[in-house]
A protein has these predicted regions:
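A short, conserved, highly charged catalytic patch centered on acidic carboxylates
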Residues: 212-329
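Nucleic-acid nuclease catalytic cores
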Residues: 304, 316-362, 579
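Juxta-kinase regulatory segment immediately upstream of eukaryotic protein kinase catalytic domains
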Residues: 378-442
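ATP-binding glycine-rich loop module of kinase domains
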Residues: 427-488
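Conserved structural core of kinase catalytic domains
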Residues: 470, 479-550
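C-lobe/activation-segment region of protein kinase-like
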Residues: 546-547, 578-634
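Catalytic-loop of the protein kinase fold
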Residues: 561-578, 584
Length: 634
């Protein structure tokens, strides 16, 4: 034994192993891979940390199946031993977080022998944590896309939800424990902004989704009516609201709640609004479409059951019934939900495209009379129900059209209109003609927040387009660069009707709220632009960048600055190499310096420079520093 041990010490293995965790969204399962070809002498001599970069690039390509930008790599060593079995939970907790509290950042010039003992690495612990930008397969919001996948994701999500929702009982699914389970599964999740967390406190599944109005624009009319001080309630509604206000404050046990409040409320609502749905009840006069679904309880979360959640599942189950299948396969099933707990009511809108999305259209309104001064209270309540009636009338007209609409049948591997936003035409700025188009796919199909789509015109010679949806967009900066051929040609930027361009319509414009830290207010807009055949700088290995990349990006940024604009988001995905040229895309944050602000929710590990922070003004110096950070001169 002693001889064997001696020989091992005299002739150690020529290579050292290094267990490496690449902390990035592209490593979705947070796997730890091992660098096995690192020369042992590299760890025992004065080799520097930055010499690990080629090994990381190779490991990413062969072990993780993606490429990384070596210039963006950062190396960390966990401060406390991190077992391989605990790596996934640790990664979930610290993804997109500042690691310095839990790991030591290794300076590039630091000697490896001062960091690692070759006899202690490559065991049952994570030795190295690496941050860096991936060059492909990144779940980023992009304005360029690849080919349509073999399996069409939207159909699979729709079909999985259709199969699994049959197994649910809404009253049970709305209780917290069951709800948490369902919000962790792609096949049962409702995208309403409520989410479950894993044991480590990380979000189990993203439930933020696209605005429902891009699938059904009239939803916007309801929220606009409620926000408009000039929106007047129908006079014929005052008697109805007076009756509701008298009964809304009743405190009752479940046994007599139906007789004292729920039934009278339903009677007056149906008198004014027409047939409605409640949990466990279907109206019947031929094919009844659930325009408005109502769920009323003694109180919100009474009995551990949330009436909003119960109504969500009830709407989904109703639309999943066989008799509604022909209609369901033609559209995104827009529906109104009125949920109440005691005297408190809230109005929501729901759509079922590829995902089931529910979003609020109103604040919570209390209908109980608490003051002797009641006129203003009745007026506000009347406006609330008048807005609901407005929404129901819009839905009736919509479904009348859908029922007679001719449409291709739903197929598993074919893009279908029901999965995509409603707008399919726009008035072109250049030709002044109305151009129709069809959607091909989302640029990031896995991302529930995706607002960028690849489309194709319906012309004798079809051409591809990028169709984007955003309330905030720097159309002036985009147009300036498009005119100089430094950005995609801009065909339309305006309201979802495809006719109200910001160049001609004041309603299509938005603004930043004064004194509110740059919070933006404005309508949802559709932006239609040229599709560029190319790859962005994140998808392209740095050695394949055009030699003029830095000069072109700098000249483009200088042109914006000279005109008083800032770009705001000069990261790798927003620079496109196409047709031998370098162009900028994604002008969501662009605008006049001093007028535009960084938005909510900036990721700390997205490669920002100092001074970039949510709700702070975007400055020209930020653009220039981002230029040197991400597009340095060679």
């Amino acid at each position: 034994m002693s001889g064997s041990q001696s020989r091992t010490r005299r002739n150690p293995k020529p290579y050292a192993a290094l267990n490496t965790l690449f902390l990035n969204e592209v490593n979705r399962k947070h796997q730890v891979k091992r660098i096995e070809d690192l020369p042992r002498q590299a760890v025992e001599t004065d080799m520097c940390v930055d010499k690990l970069s080629p090994y990381i690039v190779k490991l990413a390509k062969n072990g993780f199946r993606f490429s990384v930008d070596s210039i963006t790599l950062e190396f960390y060593k966990p401060k406390t031993p991190l077992k391989l079995d605990d790596a996934e939970e640790w990664a979930q907790q610290h993804l997109n977080q500042d690691l310095r509290a839990v790991a030591t950042k290794l300076q590039p010039a630091k000697s490896l022998k001062t960091v690692f003992n070759p006899d202690d690495i490559g065991t049952d612990y994570v030795d190295l944590v690496v941050l860096g930008e991936a060059l492909q397969d990144v779940p980023e919001k992009r304005d360029t896309v690849g080919e349509l996948p073999t399996t069409f994701g939207p159909y699979k999500r729709y079909d999985d939800l259709s199969k699994n929702i049959k197994k649910l009982k809404p009253s049970s699914a709305a209780k917290s424990r069951e709800r948490e389970t369902f919000q962790k599964s792609l096949s049962t999740v409702v995208h309403d902004g409520t989410f479950a967390v894993n044991h480590g406190g990380t979000v189990a599944l993203e439930t933020i989704a696209q605005p429902i109005e891009i699938f059904y624009p009239p939803f916007r009319r309801i929220s606009e009516a409620l926000e408009d001080p000039n929106f007047q309630p129908g006079l014929d509604l005052l008697d109805v609201i007076s009756t509701i206000v008298l009964k809304a404050g009743i405190i009752a046990q479940e046994d007599n709640y139906t007789e004292t409040l729920r039934k009278p409320l339903m009677e007056v609502l149906e008198q004014y609004l027409g047939k409605v749905y409640t949990s466990g009840k279907h109206s019947a006069d031929g094919l009844i479409i659930p325009l408005l679904f109502i769920d009323l309880k003694l109180a919100f979360s009474e009995g551990g059951c949330d009436p909003i959640v119960q109504a969500e599942y009830s709407v989904l189950q109703r639309w999943n019934e066989e008799e509604l299948k022909p209609l369901r396969e033609k559209c995104s099933c827009p529906t109104l939900i009125l949920a109440g707990g005691g005297p408190n009511f809230v109005l929501l809108g729901a759509v079922w495209a590829d995902r089931f999305i529910v979003q609020r259209l109103s604040d919570i309104i209390c209908l109980a009379q608490a003051s002797t001064s009641v006129d203003d209270h009745i007026y506000k309540a009347a406006r609330f129900f008048s807005a609901i009636k407005l929404g129901i009338n819009d839905l009736r007209a919509y479904y009348k059209d859908v029922r007679t609409r001719k449409m291709e049948p739903l197929q598993p591997n074919t893009p279908h209109p029901r999965f995509f936003p409603y707008p399919t035409k726009f008035k072109c700025r250049q030709s002044k003609e109305t151009i129709s188009f069809r959607y091909l796919n989302a640029t990031d199909d896995d991302d529930s927040r995706n607002l960028v789509y690849l489309a194709q015109t319906q012309e004798p010679q079809p051409r591809k387009l990028i169709v984007k949806f955003s309330d905030r967009y720097g159309y002036e900066a985009h147009q300036l660069l498009a005119d100089a051929k430094h950005a995609p040609e801009l065909f339309y930027c305006g309201l979802l009707d495809g006719e109200s361009d910001v160049l001609d319509s004041e309603k299509a414009k938005g603004r930043f709220r004064g004194g509110a830290g740059g919070l933006y207010t404005g309508p949802m807009r559709m932006i239609v632009m040229e599709y560029l055949e190319g790859k962005n700088a994140l998808q392209t290995p740095r050695e394949e960048w055009p030699p003029t990349a830095h000069a072109h990006v700098k000249a483009t940024i200088d042109q914006l600055h000279e005109a008083g604009f800032v770009f705001g988001d000069l990261r790798l995905p927003n620079v496109i190499f196409a047709d031998g040229d370098t162009k900028l895309i994604d002008f969501d944050w662009s605008g006049k310096e001093g007028d535009v602000f960084y938005p909510h929710g900036l990721s700390e590990n997205a490669g920002w420079v100092e001074g970039v922070k949510s709700f702070r003004k975007i400055e020209k110096k930020h653009d220039l520093e981002m230029l040197e950070k991400h597009f340095p001169a060679s």
